[in-house]
Amino acid sequence: MTKEDILDIAKEIAPNVDWENGTSLMDDGKVDSFDVVGIAGELMDRYDIEITADDVEPENWNSIDAIYNLVQRKLEED
């Protein structure tokens, strides 16, 4: 898994978001709960991880780096 993989998933689910440059995407309302649910679902399927409601915090979804770090933590939990 790479950040590029995460970026590809995010762009597929929410193509109108500036994922490359965003640092507070959820806080700024550029990423909504529907985007998060779609991305989380794809990440869970692809990487066999569990993303819970507790993980749906802006600090986990504000940028590609944040999403990547979330997935890394989840992979390490297994």
Kindly label every feature range from the protein language model.
Residues 1-18, 69-78:
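Thiotemplate assembly-line natural product biosynthesis machinery
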Residues 11-30, 49-57, 75:
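Phosphopantetheine carrier-protein modules
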Residues 35:
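Two-component histidine kinase catalytic core, primarily the HATPase_c
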Residues 54-76:
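C-terminal structural segments of small proteins and small subunits
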